[in-house]
Structure formats: structure tokens, C-alpha cells
């Protein structure tokens, strides 16, 4: 089985970039292995519908993004099956959040959507243009990390922590795609680092 860990968001709008920052953070600090499955990490930016042919190649998908949840404080972490979203999740946050919902719904109608999990956090600031994360979202990163690692471990993955790079250290370079579609396919990543594909 091929699993795609997909970070979604606009890094130029503060907390809206958490999906991209988080996937870069996991890629930087962990090594994953499984006797049967493959894990690929991808910085999806704000492409949404443009990712459809990529997503369709996988049997499982984990989307990391901000989520809008009625009545919830900023920094609340959610990890749920897309088919059974909590009732307070209304998908009415940023434009790319709405478009990602439309993309997954369209893929479901076409029969191309893989089993989808969503790892999300409610944002504090998504405008004006700011590069960085607010304190509440930064504090949510360890909770998101634990949720993801626990999930993968239950699926039989060996999750080895190989670094201790803070997410804030990765943000200044986040406008440069570290895990792009082309890099994933060709194996040629910027700064001499290959996107993580584990079989």
C-alpha cells in the first residue's frame, strides 16, 4: 500500500501554512520503515484540484491542514476519518480548505479518492500576510506529531526519530518547495535532500 502524507496550506499567511510546515518538520526529524507499505511526503501548497492525479496514485491519504471548527479555540487538534468528520468541522475556513474539500468530494464521485484521514488544527491567524506560526499553533505541533506517530505505529510502521529540528527553524525556507511533486517523482530535491519514500 502506498500512503501519501500531504501538507496543504499557504505559508505566506501565518497559521494557514501549518500543513506544509508540519510535513517538512516530520520529514526533517523522522525516518519511517514498513515491510510492506510505502510512505511519501508531499508539500501540496494550495494546489488542491491540481493534486488530483497525484492523490489518485495512492491507496491511503493523510491530509495535514488547518480546519475550521465552530465553537473551538485556536490550536485545537483534530485527527479523523474524512468519511466521519466531527460535526463541528464545517470546512468554511480558508479558500484552499474549501477547495480541498471540493477536490476530495469530486474524487469520491469519480471513485478515485483513497481512504483519507485528516490531521488538522484550528488556526489563529490566516491574514494578513505573515511568514510564521502563532504561539498557539506552534504549541499544537507536538500534539499533531504524537497523533500522527501513534496512527502510523498502529499500522505497523517503525517510526525512528532522527533529528530535533524545531519547526520554527524550517519556516524561513518554507517558501521554497522542499517536497514537490517533481522532486517526488525524479528523486531530485532542493538542497540535496530527497523526499522520503519508504518501502
Language model segments and positions:
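Conserved active-site and cofactor/substrate-binding residues in soluble primary-metabolism enzymes
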Residues: 17, 21, 46, 95-101, ...
